[in-house]
Amino acid sequence: MNLEKINSVYDDYNCNIPMIGDEVPILFASNRESSGEDFNIITGVIWFLFNQTDGEFTLDSDMATNELYSVIEDTINNDFDQLGPYYLFNSNNGRFYFFYTDESAGGDLDLRFLSYFPPAFGEMPYFESPDLVSILSSSSNDGYITFDRDIAKVYFTSDRAGNYDIYEMEVNQGIDFDSWLKGAEQSAVLNDSLNSDYNDKCPFIYQDFMVFTSDRPGGFGGFDLYFSVFNAGKWSDPFNLGPSINTEYNEYRPLIGFAGGFTNNFIVFSSDRPDGLGGYDLYFAGIDLEETGNK
């Protein structure tokens, strides 16, 4: 389903959902404000409802404003590209984290983040400037961060070896999380079970499930979405999510979410298929993780 009320004739992709419910705020990257040039992070909202009487599923979406997200947008957006928003709550220190992929003046992509405690009594956090995730930084393009369910391991995309691949690194639990993120660069490891000889990008983890995009052979065309399950200490061989999700065009930067009262999860992703409003649009679909993971 095309989220047409938050899409535009420009490119809208790289979304993230900070909270779950039947009214879901969604942060995503769009180049509409620069008429197709630079990408910035903006905010929308999705509504969905399942009528248990007649079995009808209703989906709607629109642009939205939110005081906290407006503060975040004002802090991070600039004349270069901001992509790949990713929200994280760290229960170990009680702080929220907003990660994103930032284009530098030189054109390379870097990972940056904001860190804050939950706003109290309507008082919004103040940010001087985003911090560089320097522990993952390199002279290549680094972006699209995600963490496993225990925040014990971080995964991200980089082209430091040529093609884009998915890298991983263990999180040092012995030091403050912010200090670890801002620490000196360390070597990340290629995940052999996830990567191919082609481009593998934009990982997103929900519980023990990972979705990502790849242009490896055997797909439906362009970039397709792939799925992997973490079991017995390792990720399974990825498999294509099939024609209900993928097309001969490009499917990109997926995320998985969940809403109370629904049996299935949902997946939101970007695609440049021709039935959209123009460029890349955001799409929504239901997904049964257990059934998908048992294929």
Regions found by a protein language model. Give the residues of each.
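Short, conserved micro-motifs composed of acidic
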Residues: 1-295
